[in-house]
Amino acid sequence: DRNETITMAMESTTKIMTCILVLENAKVDETVSVSAYAATMPKVKLYVKCGEHYTVRELLFSLMLESHNDTAVVLGEYIGGKLLGETGEISEHTGEESKAALHRFAQAMNEKAEEIGCEDTWFITPNGLDATETLTLSDGSTLEREHHTTAKDLAEILRYCMKTSPQRDLFLEITGTQDYSFTENGRFFQCHNHNAFLPVSYT
């Protein structure tokens, strides 16, 4: 189908890749702190606050059931920081440090996309909010890239998450959960599954 290779904005389907990368790079019982930058994300969000702590599991349910933009950034920043060799609290990040960690996470997203066979996909953010970036090529020229994918590549990503990834069972457990609630930082949170973008036929 010709439409399979037309580029399109990813929006919330970005969070599928964010989820699987987090599962492959962290344990769900690890505790993550919130940076000032992550707390500024627009709706839809969990309303995390700078300095709060959550488990990776809690954040993943928030991410995949409610598609929260702030939790995507908390998780992306955490994994990006780990990949950069950071050992300190994410909550202590300056704005520039947050962006550097998120840039490293986006690199990991693009590396994974290439690894699983995506042909026309480019990640810039962990939450799918529209973004562009300017890349400097080896010859000194520049290239404008947008956050995008195709239907064909998205199918490859879903297939990997549900069938091939070593963390597929956890991915399916999270995305197949209808309701999840938790209490952290003196607040009660309830997440309901709105995941229309995960077709049953892939499971």
Language model region names:
Residues 6, 28-30, 42-44, 116-119, ...:
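Envelope-exposed proteins and targeting segments
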Residues 9-33, 154:
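Active-site SXXK
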Residues 14, 36-38, 50-52, 67, ...:
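A mature extracytoplasmic/lumenal domain signature
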Residues 24-38, 166-176:
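Short, well-structured active-site flanking segments
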Residues 25, 39-47, 70-88, 95:
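Substrate-binding clefts and substrate-entry loops adjacent to catalytic sites
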Residues 39-61, 65:
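Signal peptide-directed extracytoplasmic domains
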Residues 59, 77-202:
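Penicillin-recognizing serine hydrolase domain
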